[in-house]
Amino acid sequence: MRNFNSPKFGHSMGDDSDDDDFDSGTEPEFLVEPYVLEEFPITEEIEEIEGDDEEYNPNEEIGTSSSDDEDDSDDSDSDKEQENGGEDGEDSSTTNTVPKRVIDDYDEDMEEDEVIKAIITEIKKPRSKPPDIKTEDFVTDLCFHPDQDLLAVGTTTGDVIVYKFTNDECTIVNTHETHTKSVRDVEFNADGDLLISTARDRSIMVTDVETGKLKRFWDDAHEEPVYTMSMITEHTFATGDDGGVLKLWDLRQKDPVFKLKEVEDFISCIITNEQKKYLLMTSGDGYLTTINIPQRKMYVQSEPYEEELTCMGVFRRDSKLVVGSSKGNFYTFNWGQFGYHCDAFIGPKAGVNKMVPITERIAVTGGEDGILRAMHLVPGRVLGIVGQHSLAVETMDINSTGELIASSSHDNDIRFWNIKYFEEFDDIKYNSKPDKKAMTHNLPSSKQTNAADFFSGLAGDQSGAEGD
């Protein structure tokens, strides 16, 4: 940090009212010469008044400000320093700009250093997000409650931990020991009274949020470990496993509604829109597969991509589907035309693991490099950095108000990011040029600050002062 001193700081401490009565160009006749101090020391008088620095300062009575006496003053000060053993070294200045310590003349109304002001302002800002959560085990998935300030967290030990959060603290409300192996996915239903979880033990558990009791379970829901899950309606949800099998479930039925196997690799993401007609899934073998829910059969399957398709998001009032990949690429599909993409955007080089839509055009993505980025996806642009982890971002979710994002990585922590500032964000036009600086630009939610943003206020203050 550079040391920025206010121009008024020196004047407020160096003004001597006695010097204003004569012209600095002429030497005052009544100034005491240095040799007089040597012959007639006034130490006794100084000792009597020494206790009150504010009423009396020897330098104010005998100090010299004329440039003609600088050499004599230096000699006098060095002699005094030898006689007094260097105790008055602080008062041996050759000019009248620093007669006292800064703290002696400090005034709260005086203009402070602008850098210090900026730091104090940041410290005094009220918290706009909950504190980080440090967990004992790896976090595999998390999900916000649809109405309450609750966050469900799945861990590698098979537990589902429910946290209640505020801007001041995060407390554990309940711990559900539901699975014998690592949790893969956890979701609240639309009403928020049920908590559904899947795990590597191939089971699906439905837990009552209020009582913590098990409401329903499927022990051997899949032949392979369940990889992902998505709520469809109040009573239905879909699951996909490591072997490429998709199943649609109804909480009121014992057996799955239907089962399909259209891919050979793991199903990474499942999504639908408000109409609930098409169910889309991405897989590790590079396919986007669309299922017609009413007909319970495959609608269309895309051309294969030479990369894993990892995440999806619906934008532009359900008219666009954007798919992220393990190579950091984004493919845009017109809704209903899922055979091949209509647009492509090359994003960061790191693979994309998660995508959370926050507006009709903007999403927050989490990647292998541990960075959460804001992406304007229709058209494709990087807007900046929302937050960061030290390891790859594995899971993310957005709360019901759309103001808070929670994310986690393999460093055993959950971090929150306030993204309310996107409410006033302008849309990007198609003919606008991409900004390369946006790749490393920190947005207000980031834990890191842009140096240009920090000092921009200082530059503005200096230019304003020069204009005055």
Curated annotation (Swiss-Prot):
PROSITE patterns with a match to the protein in the record: WD_REPEATS_1, WD_REPEATS_2, WD_REPEATS_REGION
Region (Disordered) residue spans: 1-107
SUPFAM superfamilies associated with the record: WD40 repeat-like (SSF50978)
Alphabetically ordered keywords of this record: Repeat, WD repeat
UniProt xrefs under Pfam families: WDR55
WD repeat positions: 134-173, 178-217, 221-259, 262-301, 304-343, 388-427
Protein name, entry field: WD repeat-containing protein 55 homolog
Organism per entry: Aedes aegypti (Yellowfever mosquito)
Origin organism lineage: Eukaryota, Metazoa, Ecdysozoa, Arthropoda, Hexapoda
